[in-house]
Amino acid sequence: MNDLTANVGAQERSDSIYFAPLLPWQQTLWSQLTQRVLTQQSLPHALLAAGMQGMGKRAFVWRLVAWLLCREHDTNPLGPCGTCESCQWLKSGTHPSLQVLPIVSMPINADSDTLQDKSSSAKDKKATKSTSNSALKIKVDDIRALQPFIYQGGQGMRICVLDHAEQMTVAAANALLKTLEEPQAQVHLFLISDTPAQLLPTIKSRVQQLALQTIEPAVAIDYVTKALGHTINREAVSKMAIEQLIQLANGAPLAAVALAQAPWYSKRALWLTTWQALRSGKRSSVAASDYWQKQLSIKEFIQLSERMLLDIKRICLGLNELQTDINLSEALASYQPDALNLEVFGDSLQQTKVALQQNVQEKFAYDKLMQELACL
């Protein structure tokens, strides 16, 4: 297995996030930061890794954290050694110089962007309490609990990682401001956010953002092609197909790989055929429901439907579809759903998500969605 494939999905051991190979588009930034440390220039007190999922920002932060704490980093600028006492503490999730909020983001429990993207495309797993929005919330008491570690900790470097920083309550953000305004020697804060626009301006103005978001198209294409082994569903993949994946993933290479590996991605044309059959009355909603229950979980079918709905809306607005490989424009040439029906079906998808969190049976949810799809 090559390094790229390992980065995309083979990080099964919880400790591998700290020691995974550096992603190609992160090498320049890594060299800049490590060189700064090795030349006795301290890093900024607070750093923000921000951007959409699938860019590898969490993988970068955890790798940098491991390297900063590694006892051998002075002689190994390429990454943490993985064998010293500090690295062993990281592997066990018991490093005395590292604090993580929320606790479910600790790598012993949660994975990097790479694994988050893969998990979203793996066979459906029901959401657990540990990954719910409430579990990701950072409260004021959580920030206050960090104060002894920050202000009264022992000698040496101490690191705090605040993942999903946009989930901080206003009170928590205000409590964090004091720490940002009064930096302590040898204390480093790393904030990670998928939606930095939701961070308070006062927080963003006091942190330095890492340059993680710029990925050259050629680099992304090369990475995704190699990561997929030049195939999708065992079929040779063209450059055009890779470019479409990257476009659908908004330029995020890891998200593009996860998209290609998602069970529903290869069933987009089948969804279109089912919709046309339902709309024309050639197939009943019950029969369609029974069929699709054997193909995808309801969660995967919703993801598929959301993707298809986006392109249907684009075509109805006179825009080009993003999926050029399934003849969607041709299918809509003779019929286009009106805006109200599109809105109703979109609402049904969201309502089904909520219902599933309340333990509604998948069969019931599938039956209802097929009835709605027939009316689209």
Summary of predicted features, one role per range:
Residues 2-171:
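Clamp-loader machinery-focused feature within the broader ASCE/P-loop NTPase space
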Residues 101-104, 192, 215:
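Generic beta-structure capping elements
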Residues 70, 152, 181-182, 376:
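Conserved amphipathic alpha-helical interaction elements at protein-protein interfaces in regulatory
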Residues 167-168, 182, 198:
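Residues immediately C-terminal
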Residues 1-67, 75, 185-187, 194-376:
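Charged, glycine-rich active-site and insertion segments that engage polyanionic ligands
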Residues 88-90, 181, 201:
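Short secondary-structure boundary/capping segments
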Residues 148-151, 174-188:
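Conserved catalytic/switch belt of AAA+ P-loop NTPases
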Residues 159-163, 176, 187-194:
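Structural recognition of the conserved hydrophobic beta-strand(s) that form the central parallel beta-sheet
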